[in-house]
Amino acid sequence: MSETYLSSFHSAAQHGPRPLPLFLSLLRSETATSPERRAAALAGLKAYQEAERPAGRVARPAIATAGRASLRDYGGSGVPVVFVPSLINPPFILDLAPGNSLLEWLATQGVRPLLVDWGTPGPEDRDQGIDHHIAALLLPLLDALDEPPILAGYCLGGTLAMAAASLRPVRGLVTIAAPWRFRRYGDFARAAIAAQWEAARPACDQLGLVPMEVLQSGFWQLDPARTIAKFERFAKLAPGSDPARAFLALEDWANAGAPLTYSAGAEMFERFFRGDRPGGGRWWVKGTRILPSRLACPALELLSTTDRIVPAATAAGLAERRSLALGHVGMIVGGRAREMVWQPLRDWLLAAAHTK
């Protein structure tokens, strides 16, 4: 039986947003002074929940496994480029839909894209922290390859890829919208994130997992106005139109996703957001201090000046960087992503592949 990325969520009677009670609370507060906006947002929500979905994207074959993680092959030829997605959302943002898949496109451009699929943890995995994900899942997948790859990490996956590039010989490293200097989220945002974690931590401890609803709540709080406004806009789209299908694909991705292990979630909130260990030069993995300045390979960071999820100020500050104004997700699947991200990324990957 072939795997699909969206099987359980896709078959739900309603499609979110998750957590729905919080979404409705935000909707009420954001539209408190405008009955017209509230009606439009509710109409958009209803249309989203009732819209027909295409069949879920089929997962590509795995060429290597390590525990619950796997390395999925997108074909192509040339140097292997291992894409490391975030632990927080599903990996298929990099393979969102036919015609809007960075990985499928790169496979036609002279590189061999491979995607890390972190799998679905269970309560028995509660003690697997972020360092475990690197040492016991990511590094063995890299070791299974016949040659050193280029690493490309998106969002928190870029943070993890930085560590992997410090622990294994690689041809190059690209980080895309990846946080590193967490203190630069600012005191207000970090305090709100800390309060959210303190409220959720006891239940997560009991579960042994951090459900995606906990993480989604944090994302929404970063930009509640946009969270509601996009459903107002969706209400105006013709059902089945290209913009409507694109919205459904992206929102279904944002509302899907496996939980984090308890330890990975706790470390993200406590060691990264609160303690800023990466940005403070105090993050050690397998006895190695992870410092961007010590990378022994070509490295590029792509960041967005309009990113609310990972503000540009939180980037590592690599010597080679490109600043764009496409938004956190728009860098990967937006209307200008191919021209402004995909094509320059391809050019950089091909150049790095020939660097001795």
Please report, for each region that a protein language model flagged, where it lies by residue.
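N-terminal targeting or regulatory segments adjacent to alpha/beta-hydrolase or S9 domains
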Residues: 1-54, 356
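Catalytic histidine-centered segment of alpha/beta-hydrolase-like enzymes
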Residues: 309-312, 326-340
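Alpha/beta-hydrolase-fold enzymes
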Residues: 1-27, 146, 160-260
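Short beta-strand/loop motif that positions the catalytic acidic residue
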Residues: 295, 301-303, 307
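Conserved loop-alpha-helix segment in the C-terminal half of the alpha/beta-hydrolase fold
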Residues: 305-322
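Short, surface-exposed "cap/lid" segments of acyl-processing enzymes
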Residues: 51-122
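Gly/Ala-rich beta-loop-alpha elbow adjacent to hydrolase catalytic centers
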Residues: 152-161
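Alpha/beta-hydrolase active-site loop
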Residues: 127-144
